[in-house]
């Protein structure tokens, strides 16, 4: 299974853990990353690297880079990817989010994000599943049983 996490997911373990949703999503993201060490393939991208490089807090950026570094496959941005991303921009996604969606579509079986707006908008056009990590992992665990 090839999994694409957007930067929201990589940031989640370092967000405010006093909120229940954030804490649960954080635990699930770490569980998914752990499974990517042996069972699944984490897909990285130039878009992920770029967005992580823009994290202003040096300590948080370094921690996020460490999590993202376990990716075993990496998507480069090319003209076709930018063209596909522009289609996602037309439905209202921000440019960087559109690039994530296009990268995931080309390289992964599922794109995971904690951004409900991306899920709502992208799932209508993308050829792979776009899910919240908690909901997706619950489905996977149920199917494994």
Task: Specify the residue positions occupied by each region the protein language model found.
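Alpha-helix capping/helix-boundary segments
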Residues: 9, 48, 81, 99-100, ...
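Short, aromatic/basic amphipathic alpha-helical patches
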Residues: 58-66, 120-126
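PIN/NYN-family metal-dependent endoribonuclease catalytic core
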Residues: 4-58, 69, 73-76, 134-141
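Phosphate- and divalent-cation-binding pockets in alpha/beta enzyme and binding domains
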Residues: 51, 84, 120-121
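Short, basic, glycine/proline-bearing loop/turn elements
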Residues: 14-18, 78-89
């Amino acid at each position: 299974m090839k999994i694409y996490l957007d930067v929201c997911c990589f940031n989640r373990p370092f967000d405010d853990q006093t909120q229940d949703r954030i804490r649960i999503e954080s635990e699930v993201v770490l569980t998914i990353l752990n499974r990517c060490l042996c069972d699944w393939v984490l897909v990285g991208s130039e878009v992920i690297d770029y967005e992580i490089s823009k994290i202003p807090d040096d300590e948080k950026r370094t921690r996020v880079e460490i999590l993202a570094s376990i990716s075993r496959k990496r998507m480069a941005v090319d003209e076709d990817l930018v063209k596909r991303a522009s289609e996602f921009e037309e439905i209202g996604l921000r440019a960087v989010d559109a690039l994530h969606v296009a990268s995931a579509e080309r390289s992964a079986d599922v794109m995971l994000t904690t951004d409900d707006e991306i899920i709502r908008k992208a799932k209508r056009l993308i050829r792979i599943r776009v899910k919240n990590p908690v909901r997706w992992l619950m489905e996977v665990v149920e199917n494994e049983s």
